């Protein structure tokens, strides 16, 4: 772990920004885990990444996996000894687990809710309480804060782990009120379809274009079911990019290199499924933000101009605004705040730093490879730590936190690589993971 702390749900927001969005796909690293920014870039450029290639270090997972119980007390089982003495009924408390939150933490969380009555009106609080296992009545009380904290510590422990602070903010809410692509089972179902209709049919599909079209067709089925306009498939100019969403033209870009070759390994297929699903979650996010702005009365032209999306997509959002005061509207508001609202300047700084840190790390790595002196090793260590901190901050952006938590479910549906080509001799080695797993496309990061 890098030691870089994730900001609280109530963390500081910067002043009004210029909008940015997109994603630079990162390489798979140790033990086959993908890591690196799936960022969103400026509306001036594609949401996808392209640029320099570099081996990635193992990236730390940031987050707080807190204890899962406030207090445990068990009664010693009663036993009758052979001597016939009365059973021992002494109550022996076990050592108390570390509390999820102390009194000050509970007070901060209660203040977080009560200071934002427009975000947490009674209707939202009622649904939130029910979602975390409480009686709907009660409003903001200690029980709500502790129940949210407990939910964060258990249900929110998957990477990227949620901070356990009792605040159901823009990172926690999308997981509590799952919808669309992060609904339980949806990602695994998509991954299973990728396995049967793309990976198992690798030789039949034959070309990168055919494989890309089938991939995007499959993920579009999920988007359509969620009420999100489908994307168009296109080749990414960066051939090794395994997926990126360009919201300015509503296109999913996948590089030919990521889908080329006569075979694909399970690792490489899982990376593609994960990345495409992650990017499709960004598609869903951007349409929800458009629907949120529609619910506030913006015209289709206004939505298109503000978000930088096609007018045709904005018209669809305008025709289907989110219900005001609903959990989904509150979730979309959190994403909008991060990308276009009060958090946008902070987001710009985070994306700029992860790009700069990656380039500095690459330069330090090259210097060390050419001259592995103690000084160059120290410089490489420092540059790597800087990149890990920057990546933690990037992954903590609300929209990225959500997408990074959503994508891995698709990878779980991949169970094998493609069948060997029919003309492959017996005992042929499996295909390599491809250059996408060693590449860090960064060019489109702002």
For each feature predicted by the language model, list its residue ranges.
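Juxtamembrane/interface and other helix-to-disorder boundary residues
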Residues: 1-130, 142, 146-153, 158-160, ...
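Glycine- and acidic
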Residues: 133-134
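Conserved glycine-centered beta-strand/turn positions repeated across beta-sheet architectures
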Residues: 137-138, 142, 162-166
